[in-house]
Amino acid sequence: MIPDVSQALAWLEKHPQALKGIQRGLERETLRVNADGTLATTGHPEALGSALTHKWITTDFAEALLEFITPVDGDIEHMLTFMRDLHRYTARNMGDERMWPLSMPCYIAEGQDIELAQYGTSNTGRFKTLYREGLKNRYGALMQTISGVHYNFSLPMAFWQAKCGDISGADAKEKISAGYFRVIRNYYRFGWVIPYLFGASPAICSSFLQGKPTSLPFEKTECGMYYLPYATSLRLSDLGYTNKSQSNLGITFNDLYEYVAGLKQAIKTPSEEYAKIGIEKDGKRLQINSNVLQIENELYAPIRPKRVTRSGESPSDALLRGGIEYIEVRSLDINPFSPIGVDEQQVRFLDLFMVWCALADAPEMSSKELACTRVNWNRVILEGRKPDLTLGIGCETAQFPLPQVGKDLFRDLKRVAQTLDSINGGEAYQKVCDELVACFDNPDLTFSARILRSMIDTGIGGTGKAFAEAYRNLLREEPLEILREEDFVAEREASERRQQEMEAADTEPFAVWLEKHA
């Protein structure tokens, strides 16, 4: 089932320096909660400055949904320490509140009013809040409070030059973009390994079903928790953050221009379903527009091609201008066993897997095959640890035992690990391979199995509160290592100044500005 990458691995072993200079970054979301686990109703902590313009700490959907962002970094340890500093400072500056350590929220009542993230009075800030109003009206606020970790990854130019020859200009844009689309296609085919190993949302609180019927065979504990005994990541299931209305868009990952055209079409395609919501009611705007996507960011995807945007530029226009610059992996649940929601083992595994995805052959993928890959993902998401689980290839009927496929993949990853260790020194990547491959013979070692044992004992709420309290105490006591207190104060002041400048520079009324951007 795994493509034959022996030639590509032999090539890599002859060109180890092609992997010197991998760049990566992390984003981690987490809900602010009270000591009893209920959602915090306070505004964004003052010490964290402006959520609109702060470089490292912002908000996602809700005012209580923090998002931490590291700068691009070539050093894993430095990046994780930077992320930990962001958590340390925040833990010391959020009063008695804690950071919820799980992807799935709990203690949110059905119909509870969840305050949308607020970004001030600039047109850009009001647009961001209106976009969230649209998300709430389309999908419900509860779904938008699910948290995850995003891992951003780019291969060094040395890799592309070793692989594609001496490239520059338009030629580089085309070839590098084609290389990253290969990564994306392989990710759709084999990325289910991420929720298998690291999925950590095998259960949900009863409030999450919101009284809706479900065909999933949930088991229920006495405290009202619903779980699937072999599930890995309900966050990635249809119960979590997915968008059924997007499944017919036909966006593919074979070619830069084809992908961008599909994305641009989606933000122009009217939706009958969303038209029923209306655009405005009683003088209040309900969504940016009633198209399938309000803006490009609404496209749900487990992985995205990205380029840093310039001021006023859409993500797709940035891709057209310069091609794909990096990949955003979006399938990681919050790691409940880490105070910062992600750890070194996961980052090193993702490095290995992304390199493998760049090496393995990846035939073009039709929208039909893309839909077929979802079958494997759903199996792993809902019953990944089931003893006799099998997976298929695309739309073919042949089936293969998941443990065997996993071990075959890790045989390749071990060779990538040897190459990365040869240029970085030590055996850190090989150690990760040895630790994780054991999960295929013993699923009890996976994150989902480990966290489910705790949840069955103490419930999602009890588990979440215990971790949140322990991490709050730990982070508040730890000294900062990379950033200093004055760095945070300076960024708070600078972010507030940037927001004020944006607000002062706006001359058009929001309604007029919106007509040009909706």
UniProtKB/Swiss-Prot annotation:
One of its GO terms (molecular function) is glutamate-cysteine ligase activity. GO terms for cellular component: cytosol. Transmembrane segments: none annotated. It catalyses: L-cysteine + L-glutamate + ATP = gamma-L-glutamyl-L-cysteine + ADP + phosphate + H(+). Keywords: ATP-binding, Glutathione biosynthesis, Ligase, Nucleotide-binding. One of its GO terms (biological process) is glutathione biosynthetic process. It is an enzyme of class 6 (ligase). The keyword Ligase applies. HAMAP family: Glu_cys_ligase. Belongs to the glutamate--cysteine ligase type 1 family. Type 1 subfamily. This is Glutamate--cysteine ligase. The lineage of its organism: Bacteria, Pseudomonadati, Pseudomonadota, Gammaproteobacteria, Enterobacterales. The gene is gshA.
